[in-house]
Structures are given as structure tokens and as C-alpha cells.
Amino acid sequence: MRKVLSVFTALLLAGLSACGGGGGGSSPSPYTGLTTPAVITSSNADDIARQSFQGGDLGANALLSPARYGDVRPGGERPLTLTLVRLLSGAAAGVLPASSPRAAEPQAIVPIDNTEFDGMGGSVRYMLSVNDQTGAFTGRIVFTNFHGDGGGVINGSVPVSGVVDSTDYIEIRFNFQSVRVVDGTTDVTAKGTVDLTAGTGGGQATLNLYFTDNGTGKTVWLSNYTVAVTDLAGATDVRTFGRIYLHDYGYVDVWTEAPFIYPTLSTQPSSGAITLTGSNNCRARLTVVDAATYTVELDADGTGSYEWSVTHSW
């Protein structure tokens, strides 16, 4: 299960063109951007695609502003949601007991206070109260410059609750109040919840999470965004569903048309397709051509026919 916990991935890639809709709105803090369906044109589709792919990397706007359609991109950075969930997955694995048997008789709540080090100067401290009979637990996990196996560094104190069913299954909720995540040029504060469930060979994470860019103050909101993962021989099958709000553009709804396949140790998928729906039912379909390129098809008027396409390098 620890392998499953380490490979939860969020992949969002889109390109949309000339979709109707847009406007402003308000929503509960900390999201301060547009809350209506995205208005996408050929002048901003690149930006929306990269922001969606990063799942919260608002620095993508500055990175890609000079780019035009058909340009060769620099190598794609790891999606922020992938980085975050891998960080949390590593922490969740530390909650698992060393052996599955529970006490034969009901026991008192057992306190746990344990610190693990990541070998790179960081640590994660578990301060939990565990029911030794039911496996239910509550408490707090404190990250101090903690490095995940998928990259990134996390800092902050996170209330948690959940159930450990055995050494092979765990349900855990992370309740972010103000946690900082840094990965490469990305520096954000996360607030919201991540519900992580994993068992032998697969599992899923559901994110209701806000990212605030610590440089620009702009925000991204992942709403009921679900990542489902299945381990395969030499690869991982990843499927994503949900809604993402981008600060400057509004939201798109995401669903997986064909699962994204990530070869072991790769940060780029080798195949897969995802569809995004914007205003007035306009759609974009992204299909992975290979580990180096992907194609975006566009249905700008929502008729179900894709009348425009472009191919990019990651």
C-alpha cells in the first residue's frame, strides 16, 4: 500500500477556444477569483492549459506568457497536486501500524507521539490519539521542511482524523488551515481538506482545497476533485474528476476519457485523454500522444464536434 500512497496524481491539461460565458462572482475566502464558467480564447488557452495542468501553479502564467501556439515548451514541471498528495501519502504511511492484529479486549485511547526524519533535513511529527480496538484516530501531524518522494517541501501543522483498518488500508482526512508547499518555482499556501483512502493495489484522494500563490496572492480552488489510482505492472493508472477554479478565468469541469498511464518513476504520462467543459458546454479534449507530446482538440460551440486542434511538447 505504501507504493499506492506514494503515487496519487492529479493531471489537468486543457486548451479551449472562443467559449462563451464568464463574468465575476464571490465565494468564501480564501478564493478571490472568478467563479463563473471559463471564458477562453486563443490568446489565453495556453495559459489556462498550463495552470490547469499544474493544478495550482500560478507561476505558470509568467512562465508561459511569451509562448504562442505551436511553440516548443520547456519540460513540464510536476503538477503541484501530485507533489502535495505524495507528501501527504508519505505522512499517511507513517500512521500505519507495524502489524495488523489489534488488542483482544477493548483498550483505552492510546497516545502516539513520534517523529520521523526524511533524510534531507526535514521531519514529520505524529501526535495522535488512537483507539486500539477500532483503529480510529485523531490528532495532528506537524511538517517541518518535510520532503516527499515526489519532490516538494511542506511546512505546517495539520489536524487529522481517520481509521486504520489494517496494515493494508487507511482512511485519513487532512484539514489544512495554513500550510506552505514549495516545489521548484511554486510557492503556495494551502487551505481546505484532503480525504485520502488507500488499500492494496489502489485508492483515491478527494481534494477540496484552495491554493494561494505566496508571490502574487492569486488563488486556485479544487472543488470535489477526485484522483483515483490503480497500480499496474510497471506503471500507474490515474483518473481524475472534478472542478477547478482558476483565479483569472473561472472554472472548468474535468473528467477522464481514457486513464493516464504513468510509467514507474516517470512524471509524464505515456497515454491517456481528459475532457474539460467550460461555458455553454464548450469542450476541450487533451490526448497524450507520447511521453513528449500531447494534442488538444476543441469544440468551441458545444456541438460535440472538435473543429480545432493543436499539438504541443510537454
Each model region followed by its residue ranges:
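Bacterial signal peptide processing site
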Residues: 20-24
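C-terminal motif of bacterial Sec signal peptides marking the signal peptidase cleavage site
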Residues: 14-18
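Bacterial N-terminal signal peptides that target proteins for export
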Residues: 1-8
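Low-complexity, intrinsically disordered segments exposed to solvent
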Residues: 26-314
